[in-house]
Amino acid sequence: MNWTADFPILAADENGNRLVYLDSAATTQHPMQVLNAVVDYYTKENANPHRGVYELAMRATDAHEGARHTVAQFFNAEDDEIVFTQNTTESLNLVAYSYGMNFLHEGDEIVISVAEHHSNMVPWQRVAKATGAKLVYMYPGENGRLTTEELDKKITPKTKVVAVAMVSNVLGLRAPVEEIVKRAHAVGAVVVLDCAQSAPHTPVDVKKLDVDFAACSAHKLYAPMGVGALYARAGLLEKMPPFMSGGDMIGAVHESGATWADGPRKFEAGTRNVGGEVGFAAAIDYMKGIGWETMETHEHALLDRMLAGMRAMPWLTVYGEPVAEGRYGVVSFNVNDVHPHDVATILDAGGVAVRAGHHCAQPLMEFLGIGSCCRASVAIYNTPEDVDALLENLENVRKVMGL
């Protein structure tokens, strides 16, 4: 099937060419089903949730809590285990500051991968500096994947937190989450899972994975920017202090102090982005209508086609094992001896949109021995013709650069 027609922006031309959007790892486009849901909310239900007793405000509250229920089902979690945030970055910071700053101490160890996005690295660097805990890095093997030997070496009885991306935003490879959780829980550590790049492409069942925290962004799931979700195991949420203070997160306030609201509302200070939350829920419904098996099969075929074409280009380097198996959404590469920005600019002239840069993963770039790279990322709306357009325009890069 072809879902491109659901996404109006993809009907646009770029530089006189059909738009080939291959930057969905940065943000996805929106189907009309999501856009219509957001418009319906703002034209029929817009009010401040949890504030008013009038009918419109009650409908806004229902929309807000209904979206929470949909997100909870998406993660196979309970409603009171889902905190709405702005994005994955805020979700991970919430865990670092509310859990890490309060429950880690000198001599404890925080284990992360060198491949982490800065949002799952810098907060833990700050926690380590503030608490005296030690930050321990895991390094991938030659194929870009974490090995069980590395897990056994780095996860020890001193480990209190293991924070990893389920899928790398650069390499696109799935981490051995099940093996990580088994080892972390065996020593009493909690597992924090960055699902920004996995949630759009493969199920994140928090009960099956048995993780303690999981974070994602709506805008990488065909929904609006400005909304994210944090799953937190209920027992952990109860003992964590609030990350921010203000309206709607309190139980009561007196001159002498304050008490906090129960459940996730303790972490939801201020007016929420309900329109975005409604869009988030609509996007999940859209994905559910397609089905995981259909989505994974479609995207796997696109990656397989892309990597097969790139393997036939000896003047191009792919990062991470250049196979589609165990890879989700992302292929990062460089045209040898050509700056990634030049590659992306030439591709853009042909209507092909990819990202070039360090992808908020500078330590991984250093580990790979490069300063930056290009990244092509696929979504449900991409087609085999999109992949062919990328490959054809990469051939044009070779010709233009005289390779």
What is each stretch, according to the model?
Residues 1-403:
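Pyridoxal 5′-phosphate
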